[in-house]
């Protein structure tokens, strides 16, 4: 599953995902403001990139549309540690993937079950399920 779908900017909440400038991000903060009697409400999003640690901001009318990435969460088993990369096997399809070693996840070793997700044709290991 890859790609995006449109969503209303005003309906996004903290913790949801959004695409800003072609980068898949997790929403860290939202601010609603109504400028006055005339004009629509504005929404200001502050988001952090999922795959690279970049801070992104977006301001727009609450009624406007913004892309939301389609995220597929999956389980896999670590087959091998190869320097900066980890080779995992998907537990449902049994296909093997080579993913970069995450800096923020502890306990990755051969034979460990991990959770990873795919968004916009990129993959990331999010946590260790069992050791």
Swiss-Prot record:
Keywords: Cytoplasm, Hypusine, Initiation factor, Protein biosynthesis
Main location: cytoplasm
One GO MF term: translation elongation factor activity
Post-translational modification Hypusine, affected residues: 37
Listed InterPro entries: IF5A-like, IF5A-like_N, NA-bd_OB-fold, Rib_uL2_dom2, Trans_elong_IF5A_hypusine_site, Transl_elong_IF5A_arc, Transl_elong_IF5A_C, Translation_prot_SH3-like_sf
Pfam family, one: IF5A-like_N
Record bears the keyword Disulfide bond: no
Gene3D superfamilies hit by this protein: 2.30.30.30, Nucleic acid-binding proteins
Any one cellular-component term (Gene Ontology): cytoplasm
NCBIfam families per the UniProt record, alphabetical: eIF_5A, PRK03999.1
Stated family: Belongs to the eIF-5A family.
Function field: Functions by promoting the formation of the first peptide bond.
Name of the protein: Translation initiation factor 5A
Source species of the chain: Methanococcus maripaludis (strain C5 / ATCC BAA-1333)
């Amino acid at each position: 599953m890859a790609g995006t779908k449109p969503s209303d900017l005003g309906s996004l909440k903290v913790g949801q995902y959004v695409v800003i400038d072609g980068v898949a991000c997790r929403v860290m903060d939202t601010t609603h403001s109504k400028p006055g009697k005339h004009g629509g409400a504005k929404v200001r999003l502050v988001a952090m990139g999922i795959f690279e640690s970049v801070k992104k901001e977006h301001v727009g009318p609450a009624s406007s549309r913004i892309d939301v990435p389609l995220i597929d969460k999956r389980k896999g088993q670590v087959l091998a540690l190869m320097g900066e990369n980890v080779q995992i096997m998907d537990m449902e399809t049994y296909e093997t993937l080579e993913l970069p070693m995450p800096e923020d996840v502890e306990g990755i070793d051969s034979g460990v079950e991990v959770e990873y997700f795919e968004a916009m044709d990129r993959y990331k290991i999010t946590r260790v399920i069992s050791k």
